[in-house]
Protein backbone atom coordinates (compact mmCIF):
# COMPACT_ATOMS: atom_id res chain seq x y z
CA UNK A 1 0.00 0.00 0.00
CA UNK A 2 1.33 3.40 -0.97
CA UNK A 3 2.01 5.76 1.92
CA UNK A 4 0.22 9.07 1.56
CA UNK A 5 0.90 12.21 3.47
CA UNK A 6 -1.59 14.99 3.88
CA UNK A 7 -0.46 18.52 4.43
CA UNK A 8 -2.76 21.33 5.41
CA UNK A 9 -2.40 24.56 3.51
CA UNK A 10 -2.31 27.89 5.32
CA UNK A 11 -5.88 28.50 4.17
CA UNK A 12 -6.95 25.28 5.91
CA UNK A 13 -5.41 26.41 9.21
CA UNK A 14 -7.07 29.80 8.89
CA UNK A 15 -10.41 28.18 8.16
CA UNK A 16 -10.07 25.79 11.12
CA UNK A 17 -9.17 28.72 13.38
CA UNK A 18 -12.24 30.63 12.19
CA UNK A 19 -14.48 27.63 12.82
CA UNK A 20 -13.13 27.21 16.37
CA UNK A 21 -13.48 30.91 17.16
CA UNK A 22 -17.02 31.09 15.76
CA UNK A 23 -18.31 27.87 17.30
CA UNK A 24 -20.57 28.24 20.32
CA UNK A 25 -19.92 24.64 21.41
CA UNK A 26 -16.88 22.65 20.30
CA UNK A 27 -16.18 19.01 21.10
CA UNK A 28 -12.84 17.33 20.40
CA UNK A 29 -12.39 13.58 19.93
CA UNK A 30 -8.95 11.99 20.44
CA UNK A 31 -7.52 8.51 20.11
CA UNK A 32 -4.17 6.78 20.43
CA UNK A 33 -2.52 8.92 17.75
CA UNK A 34 -2.36 12.00 19.97
CA UNK A 35 -0.17 10.21 22.53
CA UNK A 36 2.36 8.73 20.10
CA UNK A 37 4.54 11.87 20.39
CA UNK A 38 4.57 11.25 24.16
CA UNK A 39 6.19 7.87 23.56
CA UNK A 40 3.06 5.74 23.84
CA UNK A 41 2.74 3.47 20.82
CA UNK A 42 -0.71 2.84 19.35
CA UNK A 43 -2.28 -0.53 20.02
CA UNK A 44 -2.60 -1.52 16.38
CA UNK A 45 -0.37 -1.05 13.37
CA UNK A 46 3.25 -1.69 12.49
CA UNK A 47 4.77 -0.74 15.87
CA UNK A 48 1.60 -1.26 17.88
CA UNK A 49 1.48 -2.87 21.29
CA UNK A 50 -0.44 -5.85 19.94
CA UNK A 51 2.57 -6.80 17.80
CA UNK A 52 4.51 -7.32 21.06
CA UNK A 53 1.77 -8.64 23.35
CA UNK A 54 -1.06 -11.09 22.87
CA UNK A 55 -4.16 -9.02 23.74
CA UNK A 56 -6.07 -12.03 25.13
CA UNK A 57 -5.05 -10.95 28.65
CA UNK A 58 -7.66 -8.22 28.22
CA UNK A 59 -10.54 -10.65 27.84
CA UNK A 60 -12.53 -10.84 31.08
CA UNK A 61 -12.68 -14.64 30.99
CA UNK A 62 -8.88 -14.90 30.62
CA UNK A 63 -8.35 -12.23 33.29
CA UNK A 64 -10.46 -14.16 35.82
CA UNK A 65 -8.78 -17.50 35.05
CA UNK A 66 -5.24 -16.06 34.92
CA UNK A 67 -5.25 -12.98 37.16
CA UNK A 68 -1.53 -12.99 37.96
CA UNK A 69 -0.40 -13.29 34.32
CA UNK A 70 -2.98 -10.73 33.19
CA UNK A 71 -2.06 -8.26 35.92
CA UNK A 72 1.66 -8.56 35.18
CA UNK A 73 1.01 -7.37 31.62
CA UNK A 74 -1.62 -4.81 32.64
CA UNK A 75 0.76 -3.34 35.19
CA UNK A 76 3.71 -3.29 32.79
CA UNK A 77 1.80 -1.62 29.94
CA UNK A 78 -0.89 0.54 31.50
CA UNK A 79 0.71 1.59 34.75
CA UNK A 80 4.49 1.32 34.69
CA UNK A 81 4.99 2.18 31.01
CA UNK A 82 2.18 4.73 30.60
CA UNK A 83 3.07 6.50 33.86
CA UNK A 84 6.49 7.37 32.42
CA UNK A 85 4.88 9.33 29.57
CA UNK A 86 4.31 13.08 29.73
CA UNK A 87 1.78 15.21 27.87
CA UNK A 88 3.01 16.56 24.56
CA UNK A 89 2.38 19.89 22.80
CA UNK A 90 -0.96 18.71 21.46
CA UNK A 91 -2.25 17.83 24.95
CA UNK A 92 -1.15 21.22 26.31
CA UNK A 93 -2.61 23.08 23.30
CA UNK A 94 -5.97 21.36 23.80
CA UNK A 95 -5.91 22.19 27.53
CA UNK A 96 -5.19 25.84 26.68
CA UNK A 97 -8.05 25.97 24.18
CA UNK A 98 -10.36 24.49 26.82
CA UNK A 99 -9.14 27.00 29.41
CA UNK A 100 -9.96 29.84 26.99
CA UNK A 101 -13.45 28.43 26.46
CA UNK A 102 -12.81 27.42 22.85
CA UNK A 103 -13.25 23.69 23.52
CA UNK A 104 -16.16 22.64 25.69
CA UNK A 105 -15.58 18.89 25.96
CA UNK A 106 -12.96 16.30 25.08
CA UNK A 107 -13.98 12.74 24.30
CA UNK A 108 -10.98 10.43 24.37
CA UNK A 109 -10.49 6.75 23.77
CA UNK A 110 -7.20 6.97 25.67
CA UNK A 111 -6.64 5.71 29.21
CA UNK A 112 -3.18 7.28 29.57
CA UNK A 113 -4.36 10.31 31.62
CA UNK A 114 -2.27 12.69 29.50
CA UNK A 115 -5.18 15.09 28.86
CA UNK A 116 -5.70 15.37 32.62
CA UNK A 117 -1.97 15.78 33.25
CA UNK A 118 -1.89 18.62 30.71
CA UNK A 119 -4.67 20.43 32.58
CA UNK A 120 -7.82 19.56 30.64
CA UNK A 121 -10.92 19.33 32.83
CA UNK A 122 -14.04 18.25 30.92
CA UNK A 123 -12.88 14.86 29.65
CA UNK A 124 -15.08 11.92 28.81
CA UNK A 125 -12.99 8.76 28.96
CA UNK A 126 -14.85 6.67 26.42
CA UNK A 127 -12.97 3.47 27.22
CA UNK A 128 -12.93 4.02 30.96
CA UNK A 129 -10.02 4.95 33.19
CA UNK A 130 -6.84 3.45 34.58
CA UNK A 131 -7.05 5.70 37.66
CA UNK A 132 -9.46 3.45 39.53
CA UNK A 133 -9.87 -0.27 40.20
CA UNK A 134 -13.08 -2.11 41.06
CA UNK A 135 -13.40 -5.27 43.12
CA UNK A 136 -15.08 -7.98 41.07
CA UNK A 137 -16.55 -9.40 44.30
CA UNK A 138 -17.87 -6.49 46.40
CA UNK A 139 -17.73 -3.73 43.70
CA UNK A 140 -15.81 -1.27 45.91
CA UNK A 141 -13.71 1.25 43.94
CA UNK A 142 -10.12 2.18 44.76
CA UNK A 143 -7.49 4.66 43.61
CA UNK A 144 -5.07 2.64 41.49
CA UNK A 145 -2.03 4.64 42.63
CA UNK A 146 -2.61 3.73 46.26
CA UNK A 147 -3.10 0.01 45.66
CA UNK A 148 -0.57 -0.55 42.90
CA UNK A 149 2.39 1.05 44.66
CA UNK A 150 3.07 -2.21 46.46
CA UNK A 151 3.36 -4.05 43.14
CA UNK A 152 1.76 -7.12 44.72
CA UNK A 153 0.04 -8.65 41.75
CA UNK A 154 -2.74 -9.33 41.33
CA UNK A 155 -4.02 -6.58 43.60
CA UNK A 156 -6.70 -7.66 46.05
CA UNK A 157 -9.56 -5.81 47.63
CA UNK A 158 -8.60 -4.58 51.12
CA UNK A 159 -12.18 -5.33 52.30
CA UNK A 160 -12.97 -8.79 50.91
CA UNK A 161 -9.73 -9.97 49.22
CA UNK A 162 -11.55 -10.11 45.87
CA UNK A 163 -9.77 -9.62 42.56
CA UNK A 164 -9.43 -5.98 41.47
CA UNK A 165 -9.92 -5.03 37.83
CA UNK A 166 -8.89 -1.74 36.21
CA UNK A 167 -11.85 0.44 35.28
CA UNK A 168 -11.02 0.51 31.59
CA UNK A 169 -12.86 -1.49 28.96
CA UNK A 170 -11.66 -4.99 28.21
CA UNK A 171 -12.26 -6.39 24.71
CA UNK A 172 -15.53 -8.15 25.45
CA UNK A 173 -17.02 -5.37 27.58
CA UNK A 174 -19.41 -2.60 26.59
CA UNK A 175 -18.56 1.08 26.73
CA UNK A 176 -19.36 2.44 30.23
CA UNK A 177 -22.94 3.74 30.16
CA UNK A 178 -22.03 7.15 31.61
CA UNK A 179 -19.28 7.63 29.01
CA UNK A 180 -21.68 6.60 26.25
CA UNK A 181 -24.40 8.95 27.53
CA UNK A 182 -22.09 11.96 27.95
CA UNK A 183 -20.37 11.38 24.61
CA UNK A 184 -23.73 11.27 22.82
CA UNK A 185 -24.96 14.31 24.75
CA UNK A 186 -21.90 16.46 23.99
CA UNK A 187 -21.71 15.29 20.38
CA UNK A 188 -25.35 16.27 19.83
CA UNK A 189 -24.71 19.69 21.41
CA UNK A 190 -21.63 20.32 19.27
CA UNK A 191 -21.72 23.06 16.72
CA UNK A 192 -18.18 21.95 15.79
CA UNK A 193 -16.92 18.39 16.29
CA UNK A 194 -13.18 17.92 15.74
CA UNK A 195 -11.80 14.44 15.02
Where does each model-flagged region fall?
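Conserved catalytic core of sirtuin-type NAD+-dependent deacylases
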Residues: 1-195
Amino acid sequence: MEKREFYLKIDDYQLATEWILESKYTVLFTGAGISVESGIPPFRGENGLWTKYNPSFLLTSYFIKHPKESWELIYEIFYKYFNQANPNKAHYFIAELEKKGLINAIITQNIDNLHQNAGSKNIIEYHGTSRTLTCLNCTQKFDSKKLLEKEKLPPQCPYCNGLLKPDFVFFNEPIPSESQFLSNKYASMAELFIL
